[in-house]
Amino acid sequence: MRDDVTQMKWWGWGDEHTEFDASDKPFLMPFITRELGLSEEDEEVVRPVSIEEVKLPGQSLNQDFLDEARSALREDQVKTSDKERLIHSYGKSFRDLWRVRRGIVDSSPDCVVYPESED
C-alpha cells in the first residue's frame, strides 16, 4: 500500500479525517427535507456509536495461511486489527451504513489483504 493512502471511515463514506461542513449551506437541509418529504423532527443528526461499542464476531484465523501470506507480502498488506476488520465488514450502501453506525455487525473478515498497488 502507498504511504499516502488515507484510512476510510468505518461508519461512512470517504477519508476518516474529512467531514462535510454544511454551516455555509443554510438551504441544504431545508432542500433535502422538502425533496424527501421529511418533517423537521427528521432533521436530527444521528451520530454513530463509538468504535469501542462495536462488537465484532470472533476471528477464526488459519495460522498457516496467515504465516504464508505475511511471508509472501509486505507487512502493511496483511491486517488483522479489529478496526481493519470493521472497515471491511460492510459495503457503503444505506442499509450497510445504517447497521454499522448502530454497532450491528453480524459478520466480519478474519483478516484483510491489500494489493501491492491500485494499478
Regions found by a protein language model. Give the residues of each.
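Noncatalytic alpha-helical scaffold of FAD-dependent oxidoreductases
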Residues: 1-119
